[in-house]
């Protein structure tokens, strides 16, 4: 039973650089990957299409896309009408929690991942959070992940009855964006299939100025390879 649980993993998969690399890492570590994506009425819903394109190419055993009406809750520039911050220096990004923070997003996503993992008999969940090159979101920190893992093992029938123990994997949490990209390239990833921008235009082209675009540009520069992203012309 334990070996069967270790064989499967639920991977939170947005279609961006981090989650795509995370899925590739899970596969490289020998897991059968079940990719989980969300359309939460985010302004950059184009990332879901990127996820749909990438999941089969990455060898996901299954790709589940769930719709969540987080725009009904609001509280974020990603789901409402508030402007997405632009041109924030990298060194200032984590000084305060930005307007692109979505209330409790990773807790919501991880809870769905936990439910699916229990049904699948999968003891492992992968999430591509990063605590170095990031925008200061509280639910990307190591202490948050550790707390969720403790909660998960108190929350479901399979753990309470002793048939599995949930492990939340964060293989990218201490890597820079450049290191993440280098790791992905080692695993054969094509980053032109990914989407990062928080505020794309109607054609899906990246703005080039939001936190996510700036970190993406920084990552490719650090990795020493051309950025394949299609940006809006300034």
Swiss-Prot record:
Pathway: Purine metabolism; 7-cyano-7-deazaguanine biosynthesis. Zn(2+) binds at residues 197, 207, 210, 213. ATP binds at residues 13-23. Keywords: ATP-binding, Ligase, Metal-binding, Nucleotide-binding, Queuosine biosynthesis, Zinc. Binds 1 zinc ion per subunit. Its cofactor is Zn(2+). Pfam families: QueC. It catalyses: 7-carboxy-7-deazaguanine + NH4(+) + ATP = 7-cyano-7-deazaguanine + ADP + phosphate + H2O + H(+). Its EC number is 6.3.4.20. GO terms for biological process: queuosine biosynthetic process. GO terms for molecular function: ATP binding; ligase activity, forming carbon-nitrogen bonds; zinc ion binding. Disulfide bonds: none annotated. Belongs to the QueC family. NCBIfam families: 7-cyano-7-deazaguanine synthase QueC. PANTHER family: 7-CYANO-7-DEAZAGUANINE SYNTHASE. Catalyzes the ATP-dependent conversion of 7-carboxy-7-deazaguanine (CDG) to 7-cyano-7-deazaguanine (preQ(0)). This is 7-cyano-7-deazaguanine synthase. The lineage of its organism: Bacteria, Pseudomonadati, Thermodesulfobacteriota, Syntrophobacteria, Syntrophobacterales. The gene is queC.
